[in-house]
Design a protein with these regions (language model features):
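Conserved P-loop NTPase motor core
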Residues: 150, 182-183
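Active-site environment of divalent metal-dependent phosphoester hydrolases
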Residues: 186-190, 281
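A short, polar/acidic, helix/strand-boundary loop motif
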Residues: 205-259
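Extracellular/luminal Protease-associated
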Residues: 126-130, 152-154, 159, 237-302
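Short acidic, glycine/proline-enriched helix-loop-strand junctions
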Residues: 168-179, 193, 300-302
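Short hydrophobic alpha-helical runs that function as membrane-insertion/retention elements
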Residues: 179-181, 204, 294-298
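Subtilisin-like serine protease catalytic core
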Residues: 1-131, 145-148, 160, 174-176, ...
Length: 302
């Protein structure tokens, strides 16, 4: 299984070698698969990840991104810098993990769609996005590495016969590689799906009836009220009114995207409103460092 995304965090339990998989076959194109995850930033120069019989390789194809944008703290490796690739790869082919703990709450068993698959990660995206020239190189390498399935959970174009990424997927199809691509985050109106190529499996979101819902009640200084339905994955809720502050208007912080850690105590006893953008998990973690009781993620275009 080849995941083309923002990289993975290789120490994640979803990619641990549990001893239940044989060594993978040699790449179809000969040679050996690249394994470049670099040092673990938590223990630099001490813990260098070595590929094994679950996560069998990792390569980065971000040369254009790094030269054009250059904001990736894990540049030059296949290590994930924003969590998206770790999420998509584990959803597709992550191990069975019996106790998935989120903020101290045991959420039970999780697993990917194909927990018995070998995983190869191809990093093509940085914090600011992805570029077709990097993606096409990764697709061609995945073909040479002998992957059976490519997952590409990233938006794309709607012109399959001229889009370079879609044409790279056509090469994969010709090499008997199944490509699964996301339909994107637009919609649900007509003509809002991405990856319309007839040679890909394009996957859209679906719904189910399991929900844990709560209401968010906002009261302005003039007494106006507004209630929105929200969701929470934490075990303990907020059971009393708290002030809501805008991250970008808070003295001593002024980061609308909440991408920098807040000073201790800055948001004590408050709910912080952060603008949507890269890495919503990191946003929550950063405001939590400042003592925030909760976070609201808002879309500035609505």
């Amino acid at each position: 299984f080849g995941d083309i995304d923002s990289g993975v965090w290789p120490e994640h339990p979803s990619f641990a070698d549990l001893g239940n998989l044989d060594a993978p076959p040699a790449p179809a194109g000969g040679g050996s698969r690249e394994c470049n995850y670099g040092d673990n930033p938590l223990t630099p120069a001490v813990d260098v990840f070595a590929c094994q019989n679950k996560l069998i390789g990792g390569a980065h194809f971000t040369d254009f991104y790094d030269s054009f944008v250059g904001d990736d703290p894990t540049a030059g490796t296949a290590r994930d810098s924003n969590g998206h690739g770790t999420h998509t790869a584990s959803t597709s082919a992550g191990n069975i993990v019996d106790h998935a703990v989120v903020q101290g709450v045991d959420r039970g068993r999780i697993q990917g769609l194909a927990p018995g698959a070998w995983v190869m990660e191809y990093k093509v995206c940085g914090p600011g996005g992805c570029y077709p020239v990097d993606v096409t190189r990764a697709v061609e390498q995945a073909i040479l590495d002998g992957v059976d399935v490519i997952n590409y959970s990233i938006s794309g174009g709607d012109q399959p016969f001229t889009d370079p990424v879609e044409l790279a997927f056509l090469d994969a199809y010709a090499a008997n590689v199944v490509v699964s691509a996301s339909a994107g985050n637009s919609g649900p109106g007509a003509q809002t799906a991405d990856h319309l190529s007839p040679w890909t499996i394009t996957v859209g979101a679906s719904t189910q009836d399991r929900m844990w819902l709560t209401d968010l009640n906002l009261t302005a200084g003039n007494g106006d009220t507004y209630t929105v339905e929200g969701t929470s994955i934490v075990g303990e809720g907020i059971d009393s009114p708290l002030p809501v502050v805008m991250a970008g208007s808070t003295p001593g912080y002024n980061d609308t995207l909440c991408l920098t850690p807040a000073p201790p105590g800055l948001f004590e006893g408050k709910i912080v409103a952060c603008e949507r953008g890269p890495n919503r998990v990191l946003k929550g973690f950063n405001v939590m460092q400042g003592g925030a009781e909760g976070m609201i993620l808002y879309n500035p275009s609505l």
